[in-house]
Every structure is written in structure tokens, then in C-alpha cells.
Amino acid sequence: MVTKTNNYPSLVKEIRKQLDLSQEDLARELGVSFATVNRWENGQVRPSKLAKAQINAFCSKTVGEGRLKLSGLWR
């Protein structure tokens, strides 16, 4: 489902916005720390390969549940 994006700060913010999640909530869902999500959103670091897989799985799940719409988010 998730392909490639170079704009992880916008992607993470949009996922949180659509799902009405705080950074802490998203961190819990992805199994990472609040600080990690915060650094992704602020563009300080890019998600690791493992984190990208976690984001992919989370997005696939929430899209399947009809809670998330990804059109326009992926390149």
C-alpha cells in the first residue's frame, strides 16, 4: 500500500490529523517513542526501514477500516 515519499513530516502530520491522534498516541500505535514521532514531524530524522514498515502496516490497517484516506499523500 505505502509506496515512497520524501516528505515524512507532512505524511506523519496528515496521518495524525485524519485519525485525530496525538504524537504520543501515534507513537504507541507504531511501537516507537513520542520523541521519535516528534523528530519525524520536525524533519530532524527520517524513519528507519523498520519504522517505514510499521507506518506501512498501520496505514494499511486504518485504510482497511475506512479511517484513513491516503490519496495525495504518496508519490
Located regions from the model:
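A short, Lys/Arg-rich alpha-helix, primarily the initiator
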Residues: 1-18, 56
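DNA major-groove recognition helix of helix-turn-helix/homeodomain DNA-binding modules
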Residues: 49-68
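Short amphipathic recognition helices of helix-turn-helix/homeodomain-type DNA-binding modules
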Residues: 67-75
